[in-house]
Amino acid sequence: FTESLEIAFTIKDVDLKNPANRIQEEVRLPAGRGRSVKIAMFAGGEMATKAQAAGLEIIDPTTIEDLGGNRQKARKLANKMDFFLSEIPHMGTVGRYLGIVLGPRGKMPRPVPPNLDPGMMAAGLSDTTIVRSRDRMTFHTAFGTKDQTLEELTRNALAVWNRVIGKLERGSMNIRSCYIKTSMGPAVKLEVVS
């Protein structure tokens, strides 16, 4: 078990009841996540072959309805995977049957156009972390693992920090506190200079 490193933000003076003020960002980490990412794709035919060659887990579109009927199995799949992709024709079916499970987790599939290689999309997602505040003043995200060097972790943490600051109306003035911690370790408070 390799511990992840997380950065936690507590923000202030932001009205999160207004959805426009909520933070929902995908941040590309310059030094990668430090671990492999599990990506599944709803695909059939040639697209499924391409996705399988890229190392993605394939979910047959004919099983979407069955997954929707078995909520426990759908939850297990949603928790196991980091990201989902889907061929465009299957997006409606996925939304109808699995939206109730994938939506709240922020894991609705990204559509893959017919002319795009799913491996390229998966490669982009492998270095991505999601920062999501929902309606809470405190939120956190993983930005690396203990196996990475201090320089890599610093670059990743700065990428997340800059994206969050960029989304806040008053930048660092809206940050009450910021902590960095390992999965199992104590939190270390960062000094926020306004």
Language model features by range: what are they?
Residues 1-47, 70-71:
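Translation machinery proteins
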Residues 61-167:
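Long, charge-patterned amphipathic alpha-helical coiled-coil/hairpin "stalk" segments used as oligomerization
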Residues 135-140, 183-189:
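A structural signal for small-residue-enriched, beta-sheet-centric alpha/beta enzyme cores
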